[in-house]
Amino acid sequence: MHDIRVIRDNPAAFDAGLRRRGLEPLAAELVALDDARKAAISAAQVAQERRNALSKEIGAAKKARDEERARALMAEVARLKEQAPGLDAAADAAARALDARLAAIPNTPGPEVPEGRDEHDNVELRRFEGRGRAESGRQHFELGEAAGLMDFEAAARLSGSRFVVLKGRLARLERALGQFMLDLHTAEHGYTEVAPPLLVRDEAMFGTAQLPKFRDDQFAAQPGAVEPGAPGRWLIPTAEVPLTNLVRESILSEDELPLRFTALTPCFRAEAGAAGRDTRGMLRQHQFTKVELVSITAPEQSAEEHERMLACAEAVLRRLDLPYRVMTLCTGDMGFASQKTYDIEVWLPGQGTYREISSCSVCGDFQARRMEARFRRREDRGLGYVHSLNGSGVAVGRALIAVMENYQNPDGSVTVPSALAPYMGGVTRIEGPHA
């Protein structure tokens, strides 16, 4: 969320950031809402101060035995007391109106982010060829279904569209990928493993900016044994939500920073805007597994931490020897909370194109303000907001797709990458419905 004081101090810079996002200027509207908030608060405070002053005058009038004046003053106090709830409510409403407007505005892009309208304007940063790019091949669902290890029909009977049942060695391969990623990030990259809740409250979803704007993309979990309208919880769309909210409403010491968390979790997304896209296969599902990386830093650390996080995510694909490219997202393709984002896109021979497998974003203090996550500086004891970063390290289902398509053999089998050998119990090829 944005700081209204910063907007007031430099409205032109704020509006310029919004224009780079393709949005209309909003600084004047926000300043007007803030003026209304200040006026409402001032009116309530003036009335309270007047009541306090009149109360003292009542005491003086009674002491002077001026009963007529005392009665008049008491009547005025009663009138002000009657008005107080309305004035307080007006002040609260004005503050909520400003907060609601601020909460609906995306983060402004950093100055180095390339301008553009959509994914076609993203800028390639680098490539890794890995085992080489096969220009064609069978798609993952063709390989999985032919082997009897990937069952979309059974999943549809259980849960509807955009689900899959994995079996046998293919299920083991997916598990191996997740464990491999988690071990890499904890043992070599310095992340602390966390096993977070998969259900979170509104406040957590607001903190990372899934709410209120992206409510329709989420799965709400409403207990059946409570009264209608009672607060429920949300299935996490990404472990970014619980991991980032670990520092919610806290004051950290600068010496604690940076904090680095990782988790391997199921993720749940309604994919409300994905109708007609990637309808076959595992690329876009309501439930998928992902390893998430989250860093909490001091402001001056976040740019360097962003590059470090990207390198950690890239290391997964390099160990798996998968061809990929890194893209800097343009202003029109960035996520709502992002200040700058890198996407890693892995090569899929079956589609003959690159597809996103990781997204690494620095959010500045945008999420921290929503969460009230602060830190105390060591030199002057002053408080400041932390910076937050998040990234996929990486999406396990998409990594499975990439391994299947890039390691496929002419007979339809899939060779297990050497990096996964310690997790596969001697299995070197995926072929047919083995146990």
Swiss-Prot record:
ATP binds at residues 269-271, 356-359. It catalyses: tRNA(Ser) + L-serine + ATP = L-seryl-tRNA(Ser) + AMP + diphosphate + H(+); tRNA(Sec) + L-serine + ATP = L-seryl-tRNA(Sec) + AMP + diphosphate + H(+). GO terms for biological process: selenocysteine biosynthetic process; seryl-tRNA aminoacylation. Pathway: Aminoacyl-tRNA biosynthesis; selenocysteinyl-tRNA(Sec) biosynthesis; L-seryl-tRNA(Sec) from L-serine and tRNA(Sec): step 1/1. The keyword Ribosomal protein does not apply. One of its GO terms (molecular function) is ATP binding. It is an enzyme of class 6 (ligase). The keyword Translocase does not apply. L-serine binds at residues 238-240, 292, 392. Its EC number is 6.1.1.11. One of its GO terms (cellular component) is cytoplasm. Keywords: Aminoacyl-tRNA synthetase, ATP-binding, Cytoplasm, Ligase, Nucleotide-binding, Protein biosynthesis. PROSITE patterns: AA_TRNA_LIGASE_II (PS50862). Disulfide bonds: none annotated. It is found in: Cytoplasm. Its main location: cytoplasm. Belongs to the class-II aminoacyl-tRNA synthetase family. Type-1 seryl-tRNA synthetase subfamily. Consists of two distinct domains, a catalytic core and a N-terminal extension that is involved in tRNA binding. PANTHER family: SERINE--TRNA LIGASE (PTHR43697:SF1), SERYL-TRNA SYNTHETASE (PTHR43697). HAMAP family: Ser_tRNA_synth_type1 (MF_00176). Homodimer. The tRNA molecule binds across the dimer. Catalyzes the attachment of serine to tRNA(Ser). Is also able to aminoacylate tRNA(Sec) with serine, to form the misacylated tRNA L-seryl-tRNA(Sec), which will be further converted into selenocysteinyl-tRNA(Sec). NCBIfam families: serS (TIGR00414). This is Serine--tRNA ligase. It comes from Methylobacterium sp. (strain 4-46).
